[in-house]
Amino acid sequence: MSGAEPVPQLWQVNGLQLAGLSWGEPAGRPLLALHGWLDNAASFSLLAPLLVGCHVVALDLTGHGRSAMRSDDATYQIWDDLPQILGVVDALGWDRFSLVGHSRGAIISSLFASTFPERVERLILLDAVLPQPVAEEQYPTQMRKFVLDKQRLLQRDSRVFESLDGAVAAREERGLPRSAARLLVERNLRTCTGGFTWTTDPRLRGASAVKLTVRQNQAVLEALVMPTLLLMAQEGFGQRPEVAANAERYIDKLTVEQITGGHHFHMESGVARVAQRITGFLQGRDGHETT
């Protein structure tokens, strides 16, 4: 790629302003990157410059980073981002592209790829596939959690930090290396009276109104007909072998590998090895042909 410095991006989709970062030449292999819960596009700041030959566009999902928050009556269900993702790739002129997602972004990537398989050439999932399914009889309990959380979080003020270092320390408490925490925090903060506060929408911390059932999860996995690479963190979801086993049961063209590191392994010291594995997969070295 031409350099490590990203190019800021902005789009207007469905009345929402969406922000992002891009790396590489526009003529490169198109690769859309979706970050995890409470992260932002800077999640790919270390990985993207190492993906040789790719044009990487990392999106701040709604309510994260520099993208707009949704209106008070709206929600942050995992499928709510799909129309905006479709709008962004259409604005980019990408009829076919590859998709990489981390954590919540991996889950959203699975949903998008299963819904629009004709658009996704190859799929890369970093330490997540789909959310844990719930039994149908749990629907009333889940809906109650959603309604009460929404009422509570609409009235909640974001935490204020006196300094950038204070915000970085707060993210470090969640197990992130300091250098990675700083990258994410710098894009997730704005100035306010008394210092700095998050740009992330507090409602992202609330319960989902509806969760997928076992059969719905299975239908999503079966619809992932493109070559798919699942990289699991040894200190993350790699400790739950049933996640990969379930994916292997239903995704036909799946490659699963375990990666040394924690849940944010793509932001840790082994990022070069991760980039090498993803580059090889995008170049078709997994033996699976694209449809």
Residues covered by each model-derived region:
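Alpha/beta-hydrolase fold catalytic core
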Residues: 1-31, 52-54, 94-95, 130, ...
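Active-site loop/oxyanion-hole signature of alpha/beta-hydrolase fold enzymes
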Residues: 11-16, 57-100, 116, 276
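Conserved HGGG/HGGXW glycine-rich cap/lid loop of the alpha/beta-hydrolase fold
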Residues: 21-69
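Gly/Ala-rich beta-loop-alpha elbow adjacent to hydrolase catalytic centers
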Residues: 101, 105, 109
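Flexible "cap/lid" loop of the alpha/beta hydrolase fold
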Residues: 114, 121-160
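Conserved alpha/beta-hydrolase catalytic His-Asp/Glu region
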Residues: 156-211
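Conserved serine/cysteine hydrolase catalytic core
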Residues: 192-249
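Catalytic histidine-centered segment of alpha/beta-hydrolase-like enzymes
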Residues: 262-271
